[in-house]
């Protein structure tokens, strides 16, 4: 009996992706082993953070790095660091910031609920452009003597949010001496982003540690300029500033470092090949007269941003002839035991192999076939 059985919690087969609401990812055995080992002794937490930061900086090609309690916490700390540096007097004044420089410029098309984290230290978010785009002039015209940073939400394959757009924004930041904060939480894979984003000259880049890297789900890390990382560390636990509630345990720090050390191009490529095999399995097993199954890439128009360039299987259901809608199929998948979670829109269900465990693709196929077969009988 698993721990979830004992707790009365239904297990989920995750055909959606690295969603926090589903637990992020499954940690590698090596990560779990390292965390168990870390739990057996005390350490100086500042020393551990410093050593972990050096390892992460070497892996990513950044000047410095810091482990956070998720990518959202990294954004909070990044904003605070840009507002105060490592000046203890200024740090202690957050959130009472009267007289502070506190404006962060954000392209309106980048705005999303995660951007609120930038405002937690009482930063003022100044949106520029429209939801459809922005220009260099939009950003430059918004710069004032209160501007402390420019925020950029990175998406690998979305125009205006991609590497080309980031390089232009970084150029503006350098021209005006303003740091650029990049939210790249779920932008792995492709693994090239791990080094490529900070290589643009972006001052701070935040990643999740609990998504494709498969570290603890409640970890993240931020990489970039050494002086700003120093300020982030000053704000963070165990110090009594804005980062105090965002505590990262010794086990989490160790787990993230080990996960990153195993996140190599070779390991990622091996997973990509397996991913492709699963997609082809779905196409072979689920294609029928009334179900078209396509190999597709993530579509930003459908808010599919993570794992860019990696395939998925999209089921297009003939709802009229089958007598069941895609939404009804999806509901039945979730109601089963184990529950199966996959994104659905209109007459389509998308199966993402990213988080599937060995053999789960067979369970998904069996369940979908059973649901569709029963629906067809009911129509008759």
Name each model-derived stretch.
Residues 1-27, 53-264, 268, 283-287, ...:
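Conserved PLP-enzyme active-site core in the AAT-like
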Residues 3, 285-366:
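Conserved C-terminal alpha-helix-loop-beta "cap" of PLP-dependent enzymes
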Residues 11-21, 30-39, 309-315:
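Generic N-terminal amphipathic, Lys/Arg-enriched alpha-helix
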Residues 20-32, 42-51:
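A structural motif shared across PLP-dependent enzymes of the aminotransferase-like
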Residues 36-40, 261-264:
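Regular secondary-structure segments
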Residues 59, 264-301:
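Conserved PLP-dependent catalytic core of the aminotransferase class-I/II
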Residues 239-240, 333-341, 369-376:
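A common structural junction motif
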Residues 276, 379-380:
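Compositionally biased, non-globular sequence tracts
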């Amino acid at each position: 009996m698993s721990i979830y059985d004992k707790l009365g919690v239904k297990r989920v087969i995750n055909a959606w992706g690295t969603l926090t609401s589903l637990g992020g990812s499954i940690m590698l055995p090596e990560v779990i082993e390292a965390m168990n080992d870390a739990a057996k002794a005390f350490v100086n937490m500042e020393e551990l953070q410093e050593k972990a930061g050096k390892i992460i900086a070497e892996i990513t090609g950044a000047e410095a790095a810091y482990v956070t309690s998720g990518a959202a916490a990294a954004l909070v700390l990044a904003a605070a660091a840009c507002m105060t540096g490592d000046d203890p007097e200024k740090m202690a004044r957050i959130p009472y910031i009267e007289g502070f420089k506190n404006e962060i410029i954000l392209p309106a098309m980048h705005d999303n609920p995660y951007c609120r984290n930038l405002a937690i230290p009482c930063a003022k978010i100044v949106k520029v452009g429209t939801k459809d785009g922005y220009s260099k002039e939009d950003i430059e015209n918004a710069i004032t003597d209160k501007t402390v940073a420019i925020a950029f939400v990175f998406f690998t394959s979305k125009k205006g949010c991609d590497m080309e757009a980031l390089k232009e924004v970084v150029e503006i930041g350098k021209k005006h001496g303003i740091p650029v904060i990049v939210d790249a939480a779920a932008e792995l894979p492709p693994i090239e982003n791990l080094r490529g984003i900070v290589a643009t000259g972006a001052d701070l880049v935040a990643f999740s540690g609990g998504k494709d890297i498969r570290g603890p789900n409640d970890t993240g890390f931020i990489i970039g300029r050494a002086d700003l990382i120093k300020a982030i560390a000053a704000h963070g636990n165990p110090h009594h500033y804005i980062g105090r509630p965002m505590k990262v345990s010794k086990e989490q720090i160790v787990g993230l470092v080990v996960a990153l050390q195993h996140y190599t191009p070779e390991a990622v490529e091996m997973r990509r090949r397996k991913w492709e095999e699963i997609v082809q399995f779905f196409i072979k097993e689920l294609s029928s007269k009334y179900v078209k199954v396509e190999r597709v890439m993530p579509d930003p128009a459908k808010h599919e941003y993570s794992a860019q360039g990696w395939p998925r299987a999209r089921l297009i259901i003939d709802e009229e002839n089958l007598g069941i809608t895609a939404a009804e199929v999806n509901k039945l998948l979730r109601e089963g035991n184990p529950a199966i979670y996959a994104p659905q829109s209109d007459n389509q269900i998308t199966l993402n192999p990213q988080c599937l465990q060995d053999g789960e693709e067979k369970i998904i196929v069996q369940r979908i076939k059973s649901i569709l077969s029963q629906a067809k009988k009911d129509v008759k």
